């Protein structure tokens, strides 16, 4: 475990306090974020809402948001819906954990993503292949193999 990187992640989450500018609903699989309607450039989505683990990001949740440049997805997020970041033209960086295995089709359509960071536990799969398949240009990918927190 790299303590220095762990501390950087923790500080980033604390520096970017979770905004209340999301809509969400409870599903059979867990809490789903259905929409982000804020205007922050850096968005850190919560790991839990009302004591429930956030496991999904709905289709079109960030669609056409021109303000967001960096998004930190919840640690236990398992699914990103279709076109979740559709036409987020200024989205440059996406940070995610190893639980995310299902990246919906077109999730990054219309984005100019430059960088992806994946924090994973050894031996776990990730959705990196799904992300790279959608890219039509060069992106930088950083893989960190250790505990998320």
Predicted regions and their residues:
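A subset of signal/propeptide-processing and intrinsically disordered low-complexity segments
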Residues: 1, 10-11, 16, 85, ...
């Amino acid at each position: 475990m790299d303590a220095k990187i762990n501390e950087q992640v923790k500080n980033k989450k604390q520096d970017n306090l979770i905004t209340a500018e999301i809509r969400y609903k409870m599903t059979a699989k867990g809490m789903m974020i259905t929409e982000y309607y804020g205007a922050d450039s850096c968005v850190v989505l919560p790991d839990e809402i009302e004591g429930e683990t956030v496991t999904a990001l709905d289709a079109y949740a960030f669609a056409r948001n021109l303000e967001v440049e960096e998004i930190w997805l919840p640690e236990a997020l398992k699914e990103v819906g279709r076109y979740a970041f559709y036409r987020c033209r200024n989205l440059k960086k996406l940070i995610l954990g190893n639980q995310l295995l299902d990246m919906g089709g077109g999730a990054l359509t219309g984005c100019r993503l430059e960088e992806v960071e994946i924090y994973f536990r050894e031996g776990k799969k990730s959705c990196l292949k799904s992300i790279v398949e959608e890219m039509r240009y060069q992106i930088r990918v950083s893989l960190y193999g250790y505990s998320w927190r």
